[in-house]
Amino acid sequence: MTAPNQDDFLLVGRISAAFGVRGELKISMISSHPEHIQKLKQLFVGDLSKPYTIGRLHQHKGSLYLLRLNEVDTRDAAEAMQGLEAYIHRSDAAPLANDEYFLHDLVGLQVQTEAGEDIGRAVEIIETGANDVLVVRKLGQADILVPMVRTVVRSIDIAGGTITVTSLADIVPE
């Protein structure tokens, strides 16, 4: 059996703890469309090899949700899942608006300034809470951290493979 292709899946949350004695899980949702995930029938946890059937998913507090997976019915089984990441198949994702994108799709894009200066390639997204930060790497140079805010990131062209940002002077302190 072939291992699942990571690119076919989207990270939607992280299991933070067991809840109760019947196998419910606390999950920190990182999806901007948790209401869409509530309508889905399956979720992949951990190594992506096995789908779990969603019995119930509802908001608990803020971005914390309670998740019931039909295959997880004891506290011990739920505790064994603590710290694992939860994914949905890309084909199950909510449709994106024109100005929306999956963070995962930014990794690998070329980053340039509005003047056309090559800054490097996006290698990682750091989720900070206030705003995401794009890590840009160019061979032989220190990584550049680019805040993912409209005043800095001018455009994202997934199809064209580029992210355009303001000038380097606006991003990198001297």
Swiss-Prot record:
The keyword Chaperone applies. Binds ribosomal protein uS19. GO terms for molecular function: ribosome binding. The PRC barrel domain binds ribosomal protein uS19. Residues 98-171 form the PRC barrel domain. It comes from Herpetosiphon aurantiacus (strain ATCC 23779 / DSM 785 / 114-95). InterPro entries: PRC_barrel-like_sf, PRC_RimM, RimM, RimM_N, RimM_N_sf, Transl_B-barrel_sf. PANTHER family: RIBOSOME MATURATION FACTOR RIMM (PTHR33692:SF1). Its main location: cytoplasm. It is found in: Cytoplasm. This is Ribosome maturation factor RimM. The gene is rimM. Keywords: Chaperone, Cytoplasm, Ribosome biogenesis, rRNA processing. GO terms for biological process: ribosomal small subunit biogenesis; rRNA processing.
